[in-house]
């Protein structure tokens, strides 16, 4: 529903600048959700692996943090020493370990569902809406593979993830054209 509302806002934007503003905000949000949360997950994985060999100091944790964040952000972003302790400010690592992947999964899922809706024939869209309502009504009663089956989506296949990531790439391309 959020993507439907967003697409309507973009479609009905009063000007190019308004459209650019909306797209830029959405792209930034999606990149933060997907790239940042995956980097957080990589940090958690590495520090738990390192912890198997013994206790880690805050310096060890900061080294792992900088390694994973630098790898995720690439050479365009330079992280200084002030960024080293940032891991300690993120409550997920303590209160809900290994939860952050859900943000990236959720964002890619929304994008994949939207792409699935967009590629359907007009007369098939009502079936999608019915399936989507069924997904929402099921709540957490179904495994993700069962819940996504009516949409022809399989989160174990790379094509699922590409649907979500390609949508981000498409928005970036649209933004660059503006």
Q: How would you label these PLM feature ranges?
A:
Residues 4-17, 33, 37, 41, ...:
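C-terminal, non-catalytic "cap/extension" segments appended to globular domains
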């Amino acid at each position: 529903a959020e993507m439907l509302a967003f697409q309507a806002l973009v479609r009905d934007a009063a000007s190019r600048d308004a459209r650019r503003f909306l797209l830029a905000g959405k792209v930034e949000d999606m990149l933060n959700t997907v790239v940042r949360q995956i980097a957080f997950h990589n940090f958690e994985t590495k520090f738990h692996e390192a912890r198997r060999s013994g206790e880690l100091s805050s310096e060890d944790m900061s080294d792992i943090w900088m390694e994973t964040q630098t790898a995720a952000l690439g050479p365009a972003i330079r992280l200084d020493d002030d960024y080293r302790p940032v891991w300690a400010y993120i409550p997920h690592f303590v209160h809900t370990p290994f939860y952050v992947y859900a943000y990236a999964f959720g964002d890619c899922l929304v994008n994949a569902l939207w792409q699935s809706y967009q590629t359907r024939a007009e007369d098939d869209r009502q079936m999608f809406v019915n399936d989507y309502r069924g997904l929402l009504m099921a709540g957490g009663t179904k495994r993700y593979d069962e819940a996504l089956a009516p949409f022809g989506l399989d989160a174990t296949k790379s094509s699922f993830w590409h649907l979500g990531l390609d949508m981000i790439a498409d928005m970036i391309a649209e933004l660059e054209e503006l």
